[in-house]
Amino acid sequence: MATHRPGALVGDVLMATPGSKSPVYVVASEDTELLFLPFHKIMSGCENCCAWHTKLRENLVSEIAMKFWAQRRRTLYLCAKSLRQRIAMRLYDEYQKNGSLTFSLGGTREDLADYLGANRSALSREIGRMKEEGILDFYKDTFRILSLEKLTKDVG
């Protein structure tokens, strides 16, 4: 299940699939407006070849590409040999993204466990071990990498 913010795209990755019913179900937790855009109209544009249609297509392709890379990264996490390696990979990626040894992942420990395909208590136990080994420190969703060298060894 995914939570979307205002302005997010839903079903964009599936919109070009011909003749199949979407497996995506959307449930709104508050009043919501959805804009349905027919794929053929997006791709064909208008008779004026206006910049708006070009920009819409560019934005759509960019959004789909970002989702692809996020899913690819998550697949790499899930293919890791151990939970420790998955944790190390996730934390190292966040370090590279932020350029800082201290960062917040956002969400709960349960969210992180779900994302990494793990049990929450197993995840908590493993990050506790990593803390004892001087690899990292943490408080709630905020992590600080204490030894980048040790963390990268766990990344593999």
Regions found by a protein language model. Give the residues of each.
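Cyclic-nucleotide recognition modules
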Residues: 1-61
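Noncatalytic linker/hinge segments flanking ATPase motor cores
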Residues: 2, 23-31, 45, 67-83, ...
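Residue-level signal for pocket-adjacent positions within structured domains
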Residues: 5, 10, 70-73, 98, ...
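Generic structural "secondary-structure junction" signal
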Residues: 6, 11-12, 16-17, 77, ...
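A broad, structure-centric signal for solvent-exposed, well-ordered loop/edge residues
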Residues: 10-11, 17, 33-35, 44, ...
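Polybasic "coupling" helices that flank or enter modular domains
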Residues: 29, 51-117
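Phosphate-/nucleic-acid-contacting segments
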Residues: 83, 90-156
